[in-house]
From Swiss-Prot:
Keyword terms, alphabetized: DNA-binding, Transcription, Transcription regulation
DNA-binding region(s) in UniProt: 37-57
Organism phylogeny: Bacteria, Thermotogati, Thermotogota, Thermotogae, Thermotogales
Protein name (record): Uncharacterized HTH-type transcriptional regulator TM_0326
PANTHER family on file: GLUCOKINASE (PTHR30514), HTH-TYPE TRANSCRIPTIONAL REGULATOR HEXR-RELATED (PTHR30514:SF1)
Domain annotation SIS: ranges: 123-263
């Protein structure tokens, strides 16, 4: 078991006290190896050692010593330092820059370890067979949805995108089961996105969701859920990091689709030529 990954996967299920313990561990995993149960409860600011016991039992472990052994193994396997350091007002430009870059790289690698390859394969098949691909997302997710709309259009897929609810409603009114809805929402709880996914399912249309919450309301109306794995800090929200990870997931689907379809490369070359004529 990769206990650090396990903590991240179960984070949303933790109580407030357990989240404090998780945050303390993730911020300094090496330091926890040298700590006792009482040390950890004190560092985390929880009332009793019983909270720590409940925490490691929720991970499926029998003792704090077993937890520390698995934690040490997780650290030894890590390709780079496992930290989600928060930005401080005392940090200089170099330190803040390094923290942001490391957090983003860490989030990408964590999501890679978390992703189900079968879900990626199924998503590629849905993209390949879709008559039309409808991308939806609002606020920060709209930028990701538009980027995907642009990419997949260039390899010849019939794509639609809008961040206007009225236009999306009109598009879905004429959609069919042979179309595909791709819903992008970090929380998975944006009311309009959930409603559009629900509408798509009522029409027997497949839905692929990219979200940071596998157990969200949106996920319930999805055929495939591709979940990101990011962590929020005091200044930088996890939604900021998840946007980058969402783009990487869509880049992966795009590359797999293009690599398996000779027509995609041909269409990409055509679109490159067309765009080049618009430049000096």
């Amino acid at each position: 078991m990769d206990v650090i990954q396990r903590i991240k996967e179960k984070y949303d299920e933790f109580t407030n006290a357990e989240k404090k313990i998780a945050d303390t561990i993730l911020s300094d995993p090496k330091g926890i190896i040298e700590s006792s149960i009482s040390d950890l409860s004190e560092k985390a600011g929880v009332k009793s050692e019983a909270s720590v016991v409940k925490f490691y039992k929720k991970l499926g472990l029998n003792s704090f010593q077993q937890f520390k052994v698995l934690l040490a193994q997780s650290i030894s396997r890590a390709p780079l330092e496992i930290v989600y350091e928060d930005v401080s007002s005392e940090d200089d430009t170099k330190t803040i820059t390094e923290k942001i870059f490391k957090a983003t790289v860490r989030a990408i690698l964590d999501t890679l370890n978390w992703l189900d390859i079968d879900s990626i394969e199924r998503t590629v098949d849905l993209f390949k067979n879709a008559q039309r691909i409808i991308f939806i997302g609002f606020a920060a997710s709209a930028a990701v949805a538009f980027d995907a709309f642009h990419k997949f259009t260039r390899i010849g897929k019939n794509c639609l995108f809008s961040n206007d609810e009225h236009i999306i409603a009109a598009i879905l009114a004429t959609a069919s089961p042979s179309d595909l809805l791709v819903a992008i929402s970090h929380t998975g709880e944006t009311i309009s996105v959930v409603n559009f996914a629900k509408k798509a399912k009522e029409m027997k249309m497949p839905v692929v969701t990219i979200t940071g919450n596998r157990k969200s309301t949106l996920a319930k109306y999805s055929d495939v859920v591709l979940a990101t794995n990011t962590k929020e800090t005091k200044i930088r929200t996890d939604a900021m990091t998840s946007r980058i990870v969402q783009l990487v997931i869509l880049d992966t689907i795009y590359t797999l689709l293009a690599a398996r379809d000779p027509r995609a490369i041909e269409n990409l070359n055509k679109s490159r030529l067309a765009v080049s004529e618009l430049k000096y």
